[in-house]
Amino acid sequence: MYSNVIGTITSGKRKVYLLSLLLIGFWDCVTCHGSPVDICIAKPRDIPMNPMCIYRSPEKKATEDEGSEQKIPEATNRRVWELSKANSRFATTFYQHLADSKNDNDNIFLSPLSISTAFAMTKLGACNDTLQQLMEVFKFDTISEKTSDQIHFFFAKLNCRLYRKANKSSKLVSANRLFGDKSLTFNETYQDISELVYGAKLQPLDFKENAEQSRAAINKWVSNKTEGRITDVIPPEAINELTVLVLVNTIYFKGLWKSKFSPENTRKELFYKADGESCSASMMYQEGKFRYRRVAEGTQVLELPFKGDDITMVLILPKPEKSLAKVEKELTPEVLQEWLDELEEMMLVVHMPRFRIEDGFSLKEQLQDMGLVDLFSPEKSKLPGIVAEGRDDLYVSDAFHKAFLEVNEEGSEAAASTAVVIAGRSLNPNRVTFKANRPFLVFIREVPLNTIIFMGRVANPCVK
């Protein structure tokens, strides 16, 4: 599973591109001012977080679940837990804005964590209203910390929790890179924090004289990191002599089901789309014990674990009489958490389509609707902390996200047989059935922190 965000920070004359995608990388010990610092065991006092500007919250922002009992995972920093919850709030809000702009028959897939990380890296260089809007839109201001600079420390700790797993049966890794124009001197503090917190080293390129070669170099780096899954992520003419910086955040996940679907049980069945039309999908099948619950208005919630149990796929399937669009509009982080808390293990018959989703879209319109206005404005954007000497003519001209998900009998991104055989299915009328033969929501989450890594909807699994 991959997710990719490309954005452009531009000035009156120069641009900065933001790329957030899902690919392969590692979180390691980095060097800051000559001293090796392992970000995963460091204390706040060990890490100098001194961006050019700091946003100070006037008061703690009330949240929907304030006052309720918080079940914070063992050995988890409270602020890291709150950052994970902030990501969930951004995820559901952004998804609703995106779904409103799409046709009900369109598949959707994205990584809210990837998007948040890319814009957190941008926030390092932001000031004034631009910084405040980034804090508010990405829900960073809901964290019980009065200053914006500490968000980066908590991001580092969250990354350590997510990406430094000993489990070898599922792979969740991340990489970041800054590609900067070689003619410019970048703010030293911006570079230091980007590398220390996000592992994003600066690689100089010649955007001014060799824009096309620079584009090819970045695309090649992305292709290599994704094992060739994502190519030409930056389209022709997207980089030119005005480009200043390309920021790349990447996340990649590959997992095998804890309980695999047998290819011999896969057969063609009708999938009923939102518009009333149907298509022929390869429907997988298995019986087993899974965490499941029928919740409000007959909506079914099913959790399928990957090997290792730390990462799971959650499917939300409305009853046939209720549209998925209605569920999407009603979904909040609190509702989702309530549903997950109610799941119970039981014997289940699962019918689920084999599918592959590739999605790509601009983030600009949805983020502007959510209140991130100044960052995209040549007149209002304040990003003086990126280039040396406080240059203040940069803005984000656009931001794009690309994502990829493939699910089959083996799990995610695994090679599997293409044989379709009608055999091996049992009929047990006493067991609960989860049959995803109509549009459903999909989440991939890290269980202990309930971090939403990916989310989307499967509206048409028949798309090639």
UniProtKB/Swiss-Prot annotation:
Residues 1-32 form the signal peptide. Disulfide bonds join 40-160, 53-127, 279-462. Heparin binds at residues 81, 161, 177. The modification Phosphoserine is found at residue 68. One of its GO terms (biological process) is regulation of blood coagulation. Belongs to the serpin family. Most important serine protease inhibitor in plasma that regulates the blood coagulation cascade. AT-III inhibits thrombin, matriptase-3/TMPRSS7, as well as factors IXa, Xa and XIa. Its inhibitory activity is greatly enhanced in the presence of heparin. Forms protease inhibiting heterodimer with TMPRSS7. Phosphorylated by FAM20C in the extracellular medium. It comes from Pongo abelii. The modification Phosphothreonine is found at residue 63. This is Antithrombin-III. The record marks 425-426 as: Reactive bond. Pfam families: Serpin (PF00079). One of its GO terms (molecular function) is identical protein binding. Keywords: Blood coagulation, Disulfide bond, Glycoprotein, Hemostasis, Heparin-binding, Phosphoprotein, Protease inhibitor, Secreted, Serine protease inhibitor, Signal. Transmembrane segments: none annotated. SMART domains: SERPIN (SM00093). GO terms for cellular component: extracellular space. It is found in: Secreted, Extracellular space. Glycans are attached at residues 128, 167, 187, 224. Plasma.
